[in-house]
Structure formats: structure tokens, C-alpha cells
Amino acid sequence: MRLALLCGLLLAGITATQGGLLNLNKMVTHMTGKKAFFSYWPYGCHCGLGGKGQPKDATDWCCQKHDCCYAHLKIDGCKSLTDNYKYSISQGTIQCSDNGSWCERQLCACDKEVALCLKQNLDSYNKRLRYYWRPRCKGKTPAC
């Protein structure tokens, strides 16, 4: 379902300045130096849309926590893939704008948290977990 939504959004011609998913991509790319879409989507059992099972490493744990953050926002009616927000990065510090809706500010906070987590855990990044086969993700998914 989420993949179909993402494909639909991309086919609809969303530009690089629209939507939370694209903000997330730019924020992670800036903080990690890795092209987020190509390095983290998918990665392990939790990076990318959805996630299940035990996270494979510290990088994957960042994504699992991010999934939980988005899940809480969804309960509150936020649209994590399409809500747009404003932010800036100065000297390696992400500053979410105080402008925008509550959902937009919270979405920025979720994305900021994962971008910083991924940066702090760059040493755990394992290329073998890139395109990890999700059916191999076993065990109980950590609770949010």
C-alpha cells in the first residue's frame, strides 16, 4: 500500500521541494554524506517503507525508531509521506522551522532525529544489508 502511494506520488510529478519524504531524503543526504535514497532505501529490516523483525545493526535501529515516530504521527492524523516542512542546516545543526502546522513541525523532528542517528552510526553501515531480503527479517518487531 505504501509503495503504491509512493509510486503514485512520483508519477504525479512531485518536485524535489514537495513532500516530507523528499525532505527526509535531503536531510539524511546532507547529514551523512550518503545519497539517502540509494544508501538507505531499503536497508536492513527497517530502513525504507515499513519494517518488521529485529533490526540488524545500529543503522537499522535508527530506522526502526523513525518508523515508530511516523506511526505516532499517523495516529494523530499526520501524512508523513506528503506533509512538507521547512528546515535549515547550519554548521551541521538541523533547525526545524517554528512555522507550519503541528504535524509539519513534528514530522521535521522525526526526520531530524533519524538523520542525526544515521550520522552518529555511520560506522555501523554494512553494504551487505543494502537491499536486504525482507523475508529474512525474523523475530519480534520491537515495540514503539
UniProtKB/Swiss-Prot annotation:
It comes from the Eukaryota. One of its GO terms (cellular component) is extracellular region. GO terms for biological process: arachidonate secretion; CD4-positive, CD25-positive, alpha-beta regulatory T cell differentiation; inflammatory response; lipid catabolic process; negative regulation of T cell activation; negative regulation of T cell proliferation; phosphatidylcholine metabolic process; phosphatidylethanolamine metabolic process. The keyword Signal applies. Ca(2+) binds at H46, G48, G50, D67. GO terms for molecular function: calcium ion binding; calcium-dependent phospholipase A2 activity; heparan sulfate proteoglycan binding; heparin binding. Residues 1-19 form the signal peptide. Its cofactor is Ca(2+). The active site is at H66, D111. Binds 1 Ca(2+) ion per subunit. Induction: Up-regulated in thymus upon endotoxin challenge. Up-regulated during Treg differention in response to TGFB1. Up-regulated in pulmonary ITGAX/CD11C-positive dendritic cell subset upon chronic oxidative stress associated with aging. Keywords: Calcium, Cell membrane, Cytoplasm, Disulfide bond, Glycoprotein, Hydrolase, Inflammatory response, Lipid metabolism, Membrane, Metal-binding, Phospholipid metabolism, Secreted, Signal. Disulfide bonds join C45-C137, C47-C63, C62-C117, C68-C144, C69-C110, C78-C103, C96-C108. Secretory calcium-dependent phospholipase A2 that primarily targets extracellular lipids, exerting anti-inflammatory and immunosuppressive functions. Hydrolyzes the ester bond of the fatty acyl group attached at sn-2 position of phospholipids (phospholipase A2 activity) with preference for phosphatidylethanolamines and phosphatidylglycerols over phosphatidylcholines. PANTHER family: GROUP IID SECRETORY PHOSPHOLIPASE A2, PHOSPHOLIPASE A2 FAMILY MEMBER. This is Group IID secretory phospholipase A2. It comes from Mus musculus (Mouse).
